[in-house]
Swiss-Prot record:
Protein name (database record): Cyclotide vibi-F
SUPFAM superfamilies from the UniProt entry: Cyclotides
Cross-link (Cyclopeptide (Gly-Asn)): G1-N31
Pfam assignment, any one: Cyclotide
Post-translational modification: This is a cyclic peptide.
Family: Belongs to the cyclotide family. Bracelet subfamily.
Chain segments annotated as coiled-coil in the UniProt record: none
Disulfide bridge map: C5-C21, C9-C23, C14-C28
Assigned keywords, A-Z: Disulfide bond, Knottin, Plant defense
One Gene Ontology term from the biological process aspect of the record: defense response
Length: 31
């Protein structure tokens, strides 16, 4: 929840979810 993964999730889910990232406020974050 604190480290940006450099990916947005406005229209599509986080592809970086495979790396432990999740969507928060339209941006993918890790932890």
């Amino acid at each position: 929840g604190t480290i940006p993964c450099g990916e947005s999730c406005v229209f599509i889910p986080c592809l970086t979810s495979a790396l432990g990232c999740s969507c928060k406020s339209k941006v993918c974050y890790k932890n």
